[in-house]
Regions:
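Hinge/beta->alpha junction and helix N-cap segments in small-molecule ligand-binding domains
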Residues: 196-198
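Secondary-structure "cap/kink" motif recognition
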Residues: 52-53, 57-65, 200-214
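Mature N-terminal segment immediately following signal peptide/propeptide cleavage
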Residues: 40-73
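PLD/PLD-like phosphodiesterase catalytic module centered on the HKD motif
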Residues: 2, 6-22, 28-53, 78-141, ...
Length: 341
């Protein structure tokens, strides 16, 4: 499935010296960005931790009319200052922060509101507002697996995509307007969006169930039975399934053992102070004409898929696919592997 998406208007170059954290010692040598966008890409792919967050800061600094931010956790003084400066120069800045993470978000809430930025806590209709997006001028949306939380920048594997497809950005903006007002909305999917709690499980299962040769998956969490069953079914029908995830304190020992015993290849990391798999990615059938990749905020848990506000997208751009594949291969090799029965 080829998804026509237009490119980004602001060039995302390498971060300036000292402007953001450098790569963690275990970061791969994969390119920080995927290169020029094509007709099937949602803009440059930014790979963390190597790239840093200067690409996001620059987009904020270039905003002329509006900035809408939806963030699960927000604790980044540079981004906060950039939003305050934008408000001061006449840009309309609005922010939705997750209420359940108030202990993390209260500093940003207080700073931004004191500088005239309109900030609201998330609607209690959703268990968590786990979405991570920044919409610039109603024309571009940064869709992230990462939170704007500086503490985690040096060690977390995360991915950011800049989407300037008009249908996508319009749909994201419409949902933001509703969420900001605590109003009900049925999200539009635009060209290639994946929303929780409306259709994420259905769309992620479709990617997994449609795979014919390979699946490469980053997942911080594992706990949705339907997704696990789909991965097992894929392995049983001959798809090469590899999962790279987290397993701090053995939280997912049972799920990983079940998957490994069914033929799924598992590699994980388990230190909260070292390299951390925070990205949420499903790459299907890399190297084939029908390859595609999901990138977003959704974890493989029933809470994430069925009760949270989440956002991701599915694209088929060759440069994005290639960058994900090379990064995944290195991360998978370095992790701790789960033996099969």
């Amino acid at each position: 499935m080829m998804l026509a998406v237009t490119g980004c208007k602001v060039q995302l170059s390498a971060p300036a010296p000292g402007s953001s954290p450098g790569p963690a010692p275990s970061a791969t040598s994969a390119p920080a960005t995927s290169g020029p966008s094509t007709a099937a890409v949602a803009g440059p792919l930014v790979i963390e931790p190597a790239a840093g967050f200067s690409p996001v800061y620059r987009l904020i600094d270039h905003a002329r009319h509006s900035i809408d931010v939806t963030m699960y956790e927000f604790s980044d003084g540079t981004a906060e200052h950039g939003l305050a400066l934008a408000e001061a120069r006449g840009v309309r800045v609005r922010v939705v922060l997750d209420k359940r993470e108030e202990s993390v978000n209260s500093g940003a809430y207080q700073y931004l509101t004191s500088h005239g930025v309109k900030v609201v806590w998330s609607w209690s209709k959703y268990q968590y507002t786990h979405q991570k997006t920044v919409v610039i001028d109603g024309a571009e949306a940064v869709i992230m697996t990462a939170n704007l939380t500086r503490t985690y920048y040096p060690t977390s594997r995360d991915f950011l995509v800049v989407d300037s497809n008009p249908a996508d950005v319009a749909a994201i903006s419409a949902v933001f307007d509703a969420d900001f007002a605590h109003a009900a909305v049925t999200p539009g999917d635009g060209t290639d969006l994946v929303w929780s709690p409306t259709d994420s499980q259905q769309k992620l299962l479709a990617v997994i169930n449609g795979a014919t040769s390979s699946l490469r998956i980053y997942s911080e969490e594992m706990g949705d039975t339907e997704v696990e069953d789909a991965l097992i079914d894929a392995a049983k029908r001959g798809v090469d399934v590899q999962v790279c995830g987290e397993n701090e304190d053995g939280e997912y020992n049972s799920a990983y053992s079940r998957l490994a015993d069914a033929g799924v290849h598992i590699s994980y990391y388990s230190s909260s102070t070292g390299f951390y798999i925070h990205g949420k990615v499903i790459e299907a059938d890399y190297g084939t004409a029908h390859a595609k990749v999901f990138i977003g905020s959704e974890n493989f848990s029933s809470t994430s898929l069925d009760r949270n506000r989440e956002l991701g997208l599915i694209v088929s751009d060759p440069a994005v696919l290639s960058a994900i594949a090379s990064t995944f291969a290195a991360d998978f090799q370095r992790g701790q592997h789960v033996p099969s029965a």
